[in-house]
């Protein structure tokens, strides 16, 4: 166990946006990754640990959680590598399998975060102030959450349909960040009215109902870690949702390397519904609004472009 080892070397790791990241070399010569979010919101590390455990249940390519507290997360150290077409194809197949493992509900049974911003993981009709995370907040090791739907015996596909997904997506994933973006001045009154009009169109543009998928939830290209043997998923905001959301956000900000191979690998395992390409901007709108809510006006034009494309 991590707590039984002495840490003999601390090496800062660049790129962390939600805390101080370090590579810790232990007394037995092994390395782990540690992220400290001491100044972040309470529970942010617990939320990430919950998500990693939950995705690992589906055999997703996520690092193993060694331990965590409310502000510290320790996981496997993943050696950096280079993206390759074969690793991209494998990533696509892994994503399809992860999504297909499903969830029994939209959202998640723990309070969520995306970056440092709260993420409302309640279901569509849940009016409670918050949800309790499984387990005690002060334990280092967390039991894996078991909230997955029973697979269809013939296809292994979860049978819970996402008939409520469009309304849930608007209520829990779009409206909160639109409000934050207006409150911080990233979007003015006219911008907000335009995006609000787009939100009213979501139910008619959402495509056919699908089973609830097990999502990474913050899958922009920066949350892919290309290692020496495969691509790993890091920094999740995991929850039950629509699988096209994860795939759409992979195309943001230059797109994931070999994205065509990722999508081809995905289609081998779980083909996408007709018209999925036309729904990309709808699904990207969530993460773009998260960015105006957190970083301000510099993402305004991308939000408006996505809204116009819905």
Feature locations, PLM:
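A mid-sequence, solvent-exposed acidic-amphipathic segment
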Residues: 188-231
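ATP/Mg2+ or Mg2+-diphosphate-binding catalytic cores
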Residues: 261, 291-310
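Juxta-kinase regulatory segment immediately upstream of eukaryotic protein kinase catalytic domains
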Residues: 1-10
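Active-site Asp-x-Gly
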Residues: 158, 166, 170, 179, ...
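A general structural signal marking secondary-structure boundaries and capping sites
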Residues: 59, 99-107, 181, 206, ...
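Hydrophobic, aromatic-enriched interface-forming segments
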Residues: 132-143, 147-205
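ATP-binding pocket architecture of kinase catalytic cores
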Residues: 12-22, 26-164
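Hydrophobic alpha-helical segments that form the core
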Residues: 281-289
């Amino acid at each position: 166990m991590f707590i039984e080892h002495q840490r003999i070397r601390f090496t800062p790791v660049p790129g962390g946006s939600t805390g101080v990241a370090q590579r810790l070399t232990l007394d037995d010569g092994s390395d782990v990754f540690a992220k400290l979010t001491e100044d972040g919101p309470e529970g942010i590390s617990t939320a990430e640990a919950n998500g990693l455990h939950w995705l690992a249940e589906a055999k997703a390519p996520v690092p193993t959680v060694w331990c965590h507290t409310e502000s510290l997360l320790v996981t496997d150290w993943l050696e950096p590598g280079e993206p390759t077409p074969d690793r991209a194809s494998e990533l696509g197949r892994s994503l399809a399998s992860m999504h297909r493992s499903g969830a029994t509900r939209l959202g998640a049974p723990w309070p969520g975060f995306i970056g440092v911003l709260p993420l409302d993981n309640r279901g569509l009709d849940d009016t409670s102030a918050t949800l309790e995370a499984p387990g005690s907040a002060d334990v280092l090791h967390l039991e894996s959450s078991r909230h997955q739907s029973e697979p269809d015996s013939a296809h292994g596909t979860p049978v819970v349909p996402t008939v409520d997904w469009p309304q849930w997506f608007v209520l829990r994933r779009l409206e909160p960040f639109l409000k934050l973006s207006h409150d911080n001045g990233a979007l003015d009154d006219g911008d907000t009215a335009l995006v609000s009009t787009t939100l009213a169109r979501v139910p008619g543009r959402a495509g056919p109902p699908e089973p609830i998928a097990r999502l990474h939830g913050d899958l922009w290209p920066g949350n892919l870690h290309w290692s020496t043997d495969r691509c790993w998923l890091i920094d999740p905001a995991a929850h039950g949702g629509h699988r096209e959301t994860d795939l759409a956000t992979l195309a943001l900000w230059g797109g994931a390397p070999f994205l065509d191979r990722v999508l081809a690998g995905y289609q081998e395992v779980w083909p996408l519904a007709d018209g999925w390409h036309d729904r990309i901007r709808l699904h990207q709108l969530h993460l773009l609004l998260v960015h105006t809510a957190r970083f301000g006006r510099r993402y305004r034009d991308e939000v408006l472009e996505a809204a116009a494309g819905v």
